[in-house]
Amino acid sequence: NPAAKKKYSELKVEIKKTGLKNADKIIGQADMAWYQKQGDNVNYAKTAVAYMDKYPSEDPNVLNNMSWTFYEKVTDPKMLAKAVEWSKKSNELHKDHPAFLDTYASLLFKSGNKKEAIAQQEKAISIVKKSPDAYGGESLLKELESRLAEFKK
């Protein structure tokens, strides 16, 4: 929609004019949301990588969510490599979280590292089996096992 794009560009100019210290950060977040909403995965990925390079996150949830979005939407190997880094970091910051391990395993698999993907997914499954109530029980376990079966094909 050209009119919406024009309006969005005008809003970004207005944000910059405010002189806010974090205007560029706000615009970066808005750009990611804009491209995602438009279904423009190529520009979303480029914007997200530039944003994360400029404003690195130490929040494992942010890192995992960005990584999972890349798993679902991005095909460029260089961009996926960035998501693998973010996902690895999320797992370093929050050890033994099955959902974070699943994201990491999924990205490894999509990037062609099948052996390590299987190892990470098996680790996630093991954690859920030890404490099923802490991680959503059977539904998560089935999801993880289903993805592991895909990895092993």
What do the PLM-derived regions correspond to, one by one?
Residues 1-153:
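Oxidative protein folding and maturation machinery
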